[in-house]
C-alpha cells in the first residue's frame, strides 16, 4: 500500500510519540508498504517551527528531506495537478496544508495516515 503521512503522523513517528496509533505505527513499519512525505509537510513543519508553534521540531525543520530519507520515506513533490485538485476540493477542510495532502492522496491513489477523521469526507482511505 502507498501511504502518505500527514504531518503529525510523521512527527509522532520520528519522535516515538504514543499519540501515533498502533494501526498507523504498524502500517508505517510494514515493509510491504511504501511511505511518502509531502513537500507540504516540510513547508508546514518549517513554518510552524519558525513561528514557535513546533519548538520540538528544530531537528526536523533543519533537514526534513534527509531525515525522511533516512527513515526510508519517499519525498512527494507538489505538482500543478495537485494544486488544481486541491483548489477544486469542497470547503469541508479549511487548512491549506491538509488540503494539498488530500489532493495528493486523491491524485496519487494513496491512503493517508492521519488522526484527522474529516479527511475521510473526501473519499480517501484514512488509516488510524
What are these regions (language model features)?
Residues 1-38, 51-66, 70, 108, ...:
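Short, well-structured N-terminal submotif of metal-dependent ribonuclease cores
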Residues 39-47:
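Short, conserved active-site loops that position catalytic residues or coordinate cofactors/metal ions
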Amino acid at each position: 500500500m502507498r501511504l502518505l503521512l500527514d504531518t503529525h503522523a510523521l512527527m509522532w513517528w520520528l519522535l516515538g510519540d504514543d499519540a501515533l496509533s498502533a494501526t498507523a505505527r504498524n502500517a508505517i513499519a510494514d515493509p510491504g508498504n511504501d511511505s511518502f512525505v509531502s513537500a507540504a509537510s516540510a513547508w508546514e513543519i518549517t513554518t510552524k517551527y519558525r513561528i514557535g508553534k513546533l519548538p520540538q521540531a528544530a531537528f526536523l525543520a533543519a533537514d526534513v528531506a534527509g531525515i525522511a530519507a533516512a527513515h526510508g520515506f519517499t519525498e512527494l513533490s507538489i505538482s500543478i495537478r495537485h494544486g488544481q485538485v486541491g483548489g477544486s476540493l469542497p470547503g469541508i477542510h479549511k487548512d491549506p496544508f491538509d488540503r494539498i495532502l488530500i489532493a495528493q492522496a486523491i491524485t496519487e491513489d494513496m491512503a493517508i495516515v492521519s488522526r484527522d477523521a474529516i479527511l475521510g469526507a473526501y473519499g480517501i482511505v484514512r488509516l488510524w
